[in-house]
């Protein structure tokens, strides 16, 4: 185990967050309590893609389009970039269940609330099980990044990777991002 004692644990309420948290903790710290907080949930990718291109409201159509391309990853990156630019751009906030400013505020508030709680309770370690968009926004906040640079991070984040922050008082500092050398392929 990377950690020397039972951590303070938070997980988003999405199934993948809960499953990953349970699996990881059962291996290392079965006694750990998981605090579920939906503020750590991912944004609605499907809606962000569908508002950019209505056909993509059917996820299989996006998969079919991507599969037809000579360079599927580059094509998907282009679609992702366009969809994110539309979502974060400001002209269409009213068209989303959760606008970019609302998502950004939700994540930044969750991060600050966690930092405040950890500064008070002072556990040696804390672990949050969440998703790439949330991690990108949290890292973007700490680093002062623009939405475009924030989502450039999102595109690079690997599932089950680790990002490490440390607290100075109740202010987070980024120590590492997207560590995944421990994942065996």
Predicted regions and their residues:
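GST superfamily/GST-like fold recognition
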Residues: 132-136
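Domain-level recognition of soluble alpha/beta enzyme cores
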Residues: 146-171
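Beta-strand elements within well-structured catalytic alpha/beta cores of enzymes
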Residues: 10, 123-130
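Alpha-helical packing segments of well-folded alpha/beta enzyme cores
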Residues: 17-20, 99, 103-114
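Phosphate-coordination/substrate-recognition cap region in phosphate-metabolizing enzymes
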Residues: 2-78
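ANL superfamily AMP-binding
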Residues: 1-5, 110-112, 116
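Acidic, His/Gly-rich catalytic cores of divalent-metal-dependent hydrolytic chemistry
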Residues: 172-185
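Short glycine/proline- and acidic residue-enriched helix-loop micro-motifs
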Residues: 61-102
